[in-house]
Design a protein with these regions (language model features):
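N-terminal Rossmann-like dinucleotide-binding module
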Residues: 1-61
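Rossmann-fold NAD(P)-binding glycine/threonine-rich loop
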Residues: 93, 97-105, 109, 117-138, ...
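Rossmann-like NAD(P)H-binding beta-loop-alpha module
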Residues: 140-210
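Conserved N-terminal Rossmann-fold NAD(P) cofactor-binding segment
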Residues: 50-83
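C-terminal catalytic/substrate-binding lobe primarily of soluble NAD(P)-dependent oxidoreductases
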Residues: 1-10, 188, 192-438
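Short, ordered loop/turn segments at secondary-structure junctions
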Residues: 49, 94, 118-121, 144-145, ...
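Rossmann-like NAD(P)-binding element
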Residues: 72, 79-99, 112-116
């Protein structure tokens, strides 16, 4: 993107790009560590439920007292969004309902939004993106997180004239992880409870990485941004290393494991018996591409590309992602170019709540990474037609029916407040896209 010279010029002229950060957790702290070493960039406001903790975070990532004193800290995110001393908002709370509210307020106030909050994006991103476009502001995925990095690879492949067969990321997966809870998660990671606590690791958040929910959310986000298909019955998580991507993730008709030619999928870094996969992609992202003619296929071989046995399918991948350390790219792309680093375009994929165990009438759902539900990726048209409850709203609401373990929870199975802003917005989005498909 060749941004650095523009940033230097802004630094020289005293005209930095200014940011309001909402949520100073892990992602936010990684961004903050880079913000003070980047010319032409300034954080003017930080909104967090605990402003004093946010100040300590700034100190911990290397900010000086002078730099901390130059920022306005608050626990009132909506009021912060309404101010006029910044160019772009970074929404990094991870709370779906709050994320929707913050994004809508940002759009109302003409601010670009970098949506770190994939939970909110999958819950309501298709409609948020439409509202942002109508208001003339950028609604963007967060560069550094796996969805944006995957979208970049997809865009590269398509812009080069290749067909995208599959795209996604890697993770650590075994089928039994779907039932993991915050009480069992550290055993699966091989980390002691004491070490996790000392490192400040949130058991519910880390459990959402393990139980498949986060993978489902990220693949839904990619599907919605790149018009790729979700599998018909959830992610399959095939064990696969970097060198085998083109072999495993080609269509079933060509000898691979893909249900759909042009879908999202997550590959596991471990075999089903627990053995490690060779050259795993646990922390990375990939795209599998197909040559559209014999000449391009021949070039794959000539230039050392790793292909399947036919020579027509190959893969490009990035074996890492640096989370908030790379977020600046989204900020600069939105403000200097007016272009998102990936953005929702349609409603292809949805993530629905699945019971982890038998649930009784009156039980309160505890959402992503909890003890009651995990999130499963499904085609959005299936989710809407069957009136399934999105995982982003499966928190703090009571069941009015008993649910058997492994079954999806529906809107009719819970007591919800139709006047709740996030629920009302989601319902309006479902109506919009249902009508569009008719």
């Amino acid at each position: 993107m060749y941004l650095y010279s523009e940033l230097q010029e802004r630094e020289k002229n005293g005209n930095p790009i200014s940011v309001c950060l909402i949520g100073a957790g892990k992602f936010g702290s990684m961004f903050l560590s880079q913000s003070v070493t980047t010319p032409g960039l300034q954080v003017t406001r930080i909104a967090d439920l605990d402003p004093s903790r946010a100040k300590l975070t700034c100190k911990a990532v290397g900010w000086s007292d002078v730099q901390i004193d130059s920022v306005h800290f608050t626990d009132d995110a909506l009021r912060a969004i309404q101010q006029d001393d910044f160019d772009v908002i970074v929404e990094a709370t991870g709370h779906p309902s709050a994320g929707v509210k913050h994004a809508r307020e940002a759009i109302k106030n003409g601010k670009h939004i970098i949506m770190v909050n994939v939970e909110a994006d999958v819950l309501a991103g298709p409609l948020l993106a439409k509202e942002a476009a109508s208001a003339g502001v950028v609604y963007s995925m967060a560069y550094g997180d796996q969805p944006a990095l995957t979208c970049e690879l997809v865009d590269w492949a398509r812009s080069c004239g290749f067909h995208v067969t599959a795209a996604g990321k890697g993770t650590k997966y075994l089928p039994q992880y779907h039932l993991s809870t915050p009480e069992t998660v550290w055993n699966h990671y091989g980390i002691s409870v004491e070490d996790a606590a000392q490192a400040g690791m949130n058991s519910k958040m880390f459990n959402s990485f393990l139980d498949g929910t986060k993978s489902a959310l990220e693949m839904a986000a990619i599907a919605n941004a790149c018009n790729l298909a979700p599998p018909s019955n959830g992610l399959q998580f095939p064990p696969c290393g970097m060198n085998d991507l083109a072999h495993v993730l080609r269509p079933a008709s060509a000898g691979g494991q893909l249900e759909i030619n042009g879908q999202v999928e997550v590959v596991s870094s471990i075999e089903r018996d627990g053995r490690p996969v060779t050259n795993d992609l646990r922390w990375g992202v990939y795209v599998v591409l197909e040559a559209q003619n014999d000449y391009a296929s021949k070039c794959f071989k000539e230039y050392g590309m790793n292909t399947d046995s036919s020579g027509r399918y190959s893969a490009m991948f990035k074996p890492f992602h640096l989370i908030g350390l790379e977020l600046n790219i989204s900020i600069f792309s939105a403000t200097l170019r007016g272009v998102p680093t990936g953005s929702t375009k349609d409603f292809c994929g949805d993530v629905v709540a699945i019971a982890k165990r038998d649930l009784k009438v009156g039980e309160i759902l505890d959402g992503e990474g909890g003890v009651t539900v995990w999130g499963k990726l499904l085609p959005a048209d299936v989710s809407i037609a069957k009136r399934y409850l999105p995982i982003g709203l499966a928190q703090g609401i009571a069941l009015n029916k008993s649910i058997t373990a492994g079954n999806a929870i529906g809107w009719d199975d819970v007591k919800f407040n139709v006047t709740d802003d996030a629920i009302a917005f989601r319902k309006s989005m479902e109506c919009l896209f249902s009508a569009k498909d008719k």
